[in-house]
């Protein structure tokens, strides 16, 4: 059996970058393996035989999975196989989906499934951007109609220099980290974060990445020349064109009037009524009603776009750069550690902050870092009632995970380090109303709630979503877009940051690419809008509260010798469990000797400190201790004073009487009050029972309260 291996190769960041095909997954419409270093990602693209009926969207599904075998591990836990997708896998799948989705032809409704597996992972190169290149390459060499290719790269800036597809080590040192995807002529997707970097630097990073993207596109073109299949043609529906002309003639002006209604619900109700009227007047057959509704949606979109492009009038009457009215309230409920309501027009986020011990952080496992503890978390929830829909709540969606990650990345650079603020921090954003920009409302509400919680952030962070309406060479950038402007427009460009620079950025488009001019204007307009919002946020709460909530745990820090940590824990955790049960505190122990006590009251913290200090006591000559007898011989008994610290009670030191054997008076398990009489050069302890003074409290009495 002969199998042809087809390979093309270039170099990225000093490492070979290879795309290969021909010897695997041959029943898929297209399949490739993309390699950089020892990291390899398989991507397969499959198309259904027939299109779906009665839909007006592209049924594209992207799945990305990081196989444990790729980095030489067996899954932990009882079930030894990969489970549901992790948050990271979902986020990478979204990054693969977003740049390819705009590049399928209009009217193409066949199911497309893109599956990406990380087959091998080294300790240098992140496989996520290889998945973007692989998805494009698999589609490009297949017979699936795809108006690509595109490519994706990660751009980082380390010590002032831009690097494409950096190693993990380089990425950790970067002040800019973005994933950029683009075609030969323009950028189609951006996702990433920065440490308060000026917009000009972000744009420079995008353009730098685009130069490398062109090289990877040439590589895909070379691969297609070697093995590309003939593309299927998408049929033009002549009947649809006729129906569109009729609907447009009947409804265009009426829809234009409806767009003068600024209330979203009333406007949509009127637009729906116009369609019902058109359906009856034009006598559209029942079997074509679904198709007619999709065509009508396009006409509605065109009316909105024409109003903005030609008259500068938006759906709610605002100018292109105008931001909706903002209302802010902080400290909403007393029992939340921090809370805020951020309302912008018909978009509202209720955001809370909860502080906890460091051990309450999220444990995550990834190819990059293995198992790590994440102390700052942001969770975004989008209930159906926020849009007035009568639907039951569902499991967390990919969209919710993506929006939460975007907002988390925006706030994280301003979160103080663990040494300064030793708490795990959980931010939760519940969207109460939605009409566009809910993730950016989450950023603003999150910053306000963190200030309210007393988290010592140096600055507020705000976010704004920008839109675009583009027709040929004419375009208008929209600030603070509505939901309809997002759905019917050409771009959703979210930018978050402080007054000093950008911390998070995300761009999705529905056209085939954006020029540098459009990106530059969008970033500038976003900065102006962000600064306006920040002014209002500083008016609401100008600085973080001086103290955390009385209902939040206080942190008391102790420094002990590292060899005392096992003593604090005790056998099978006995000692630390006892402290926690009696004081209701939480305790984090560091192997280096740092002890953090999280308590909800000053008294509980003081009691826990006292109990720990008693535990780590050093045995001193002349002091009185309690001890448990662990062994008895004729010549004496062995008494444990502290965990692991045995002493000898000689038979002559038990009573004033002469005893033949210690067993006459003492048995294993007895708890005795003894006085330390001697500690020799080797640390061996001798104690006396007969010389114990009356009315003296043992220094380690705490250990024996239950005895």
Curated annotation (Swiss-Prot):
Keywords: Cytoplasm, Magnesium, Metal-binding, Nucleotidyltransferase, RNA-binding, Transferase. Its main location: cytoplasm. Residues 553-612 form the KH domain. Its EC number is 2.7.7.8. One of its GO terms (cellular component) is cytosol. CDD domains: KH-I_PNPase, RNase_PH_PNPase_1, RNase_PH_PNPase_2. Mg(2+) binds at residues 486, 492. It is found in: Cytoplasm. GO terms for biological process: mRNA catabolic process; RNA processing. One of its GO terms (molecular function) is magnesium ion binding. It catalyses: RNA(n+1) + phosphate = RNA(n) + a ribonucleoside 5'-diphosphate. It comes from the Bacteria. It is an enzyme of class 2 (transferase). SMART domains: KH, S1. InterPro entries: ExoRNase_PH_dom1, ExoRNase_PH_dom2, ExoRNase_PH_dom2_sf, KH_dom, KH_dom_type_1, KH_dom_type_1_sf, NA-bd_OB-fold, PNPase. Its cofactor is Mg(2+). HAMAP family: PNPase. Belongs to the polyribonucleotide nucleotidyltransferase family. Involved in mRNA degradation. Catalyzes the phosphorolysis of single-stranded polyribonucleotides processively in the 3'- to 5'-direction. This is Polyribonucleotide nucleotidyltransferase. It comes from Sulfurihydrogenibium azorense (strain DSM 15241 / OCM 825 / Az-Fu1).
């Amino acid at each position: 059996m002969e199998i042809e291996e087809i390979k093309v190769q270039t170099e990225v960041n000093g490492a070979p970058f290879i795309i290969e095909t021909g010897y695997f997954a041959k029943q898929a419409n297209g399949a490739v393996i993309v390699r950089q270093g020892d990291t390899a990602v398989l991507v397969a693209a499959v198309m259904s035989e027939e299109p779906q009926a009665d839909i007006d969207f592209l049924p594209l599904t992207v799945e990305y999975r990081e196989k444990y075998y790729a980095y030489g591990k067996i899954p932990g836990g009882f079930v030894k196989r990969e489970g549901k997708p992790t948050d990271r896998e979902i986020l990478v799948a979204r990054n693969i989906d977003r740049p390819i989705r705009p590049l399928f032809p209009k009217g193409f409704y066949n199911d497309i499934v893109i599956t990406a597996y990380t087959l091998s992972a080294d300790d240098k190169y992140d496989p996520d951007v290889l998945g973007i290149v692989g998805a494009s390459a698999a589609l490009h060499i297949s017979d699936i109609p795809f108006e690509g290719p595109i490519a994706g790269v990660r751009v980082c800036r380390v010590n002032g220099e831009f690097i494409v597809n950096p190693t993990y080590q380089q990425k950790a040192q970067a002040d800019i980290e973005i994933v950029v995807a683009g075609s030969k002529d323009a950028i189609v997707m951006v996702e990433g974060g920065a440490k308060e970097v000026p917009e000009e630097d972000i744009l420079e990073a995008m353009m730098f990445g685009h130069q490398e993207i062109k090289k990877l596109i040439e590589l895909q073109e070379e691969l297609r020349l070697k093995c590309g299949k003939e593309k299927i043609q998408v049929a033009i529906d002549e009947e649809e064109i006729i129906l569109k002309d009729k609907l447009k003639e009947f409804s265009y002006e009426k829809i234009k009037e409806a767009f003068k209604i600024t209330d979203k619900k009333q406007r949509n109700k009127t637009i729906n009524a116009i369609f019902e009227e058109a359906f009856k007047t034009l006598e559209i057959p029942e079997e074509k009603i679904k198709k007619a509704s999709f065509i009508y949606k396009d006409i509605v979109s065109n009316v909105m776009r024409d109003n903005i492009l030609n008259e500068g009038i938006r759906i709610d009457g605002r100018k292109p750069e105008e931001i909706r009215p903002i209302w802010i309230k902080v400290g909403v409920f007393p029992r939340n550690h921090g809370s805020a309501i951020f309302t912008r027009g018909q978009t509202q986020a209720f955001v809370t902050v909860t502080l906890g011990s460091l051990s309450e952080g999220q444990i995550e496992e990834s190819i990059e870092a293995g198992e790590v503890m994440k102390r700052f978390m942001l969770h975004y929830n989008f209930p159906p009632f926020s849009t007035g829909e009568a639907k039951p709540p569902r499991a967390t969606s990919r969209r919710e995970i993506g929006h939460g990650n975007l907002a988390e990345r925006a706030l994280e650079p301003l979160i103080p380090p663990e040494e300064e603020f030793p708490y795990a921090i959980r931010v939760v954003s519940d969207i109460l109303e939605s009409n566009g920009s809910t993730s950016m409302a989450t950023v603003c509400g999150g910053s306000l709630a963190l200030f309210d919680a007393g988290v010592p952030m140096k600055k507020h962070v705000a976010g704004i979503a920008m839109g675009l309406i583009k027709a040929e060479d004419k375009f208008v950038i929209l600030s603070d877009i509505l939901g309809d402007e997002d759905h019917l427009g050409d771009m959703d460009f979210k930018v978050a940051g402080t007054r000093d620079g950008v911390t998070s950025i995300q761009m999705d488009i529905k056209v085939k690419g954006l020029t540098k001019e459009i990106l530059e204007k969008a970033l500038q307009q976003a900065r102006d809008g962000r600064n306006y919002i920040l002014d209002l946020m500083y008016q609401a709460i100008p600085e973080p509260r001086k103290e955390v909530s009385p209902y939040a745990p206080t942190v008391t820090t102790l420094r002990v010798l590292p060899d005392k940590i096992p003593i604090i824990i005790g056998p099978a955790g006995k000692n630390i469990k006892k402290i926690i049960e009696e004081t209701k505190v939480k305790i984090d122990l560091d192997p280096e000797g740092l002890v953090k006590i999280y308590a909800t009251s000053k008294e509980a913290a003081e009691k826990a400190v006292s109990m720990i200090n008693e535990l780590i006591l050093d045995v001193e000559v002349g002091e009185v201790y309690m001890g448990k007898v662990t062994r008895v011989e004729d010549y004496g008994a062995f008494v444990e004073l502290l965990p692991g610290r045995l002493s000898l009670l000689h038979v002559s030191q038990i009573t004033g009487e002469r005893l033949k054997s210690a067993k006459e008076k003492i048995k294993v398990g007895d708890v005795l009050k003894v006085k330390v009489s001697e500690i020799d050069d080797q640390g061996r302890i001798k104690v006396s029972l007969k010389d114990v003074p009356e009315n003296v409290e043992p220094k380690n009495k705490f250990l024996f309260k239950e005895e």
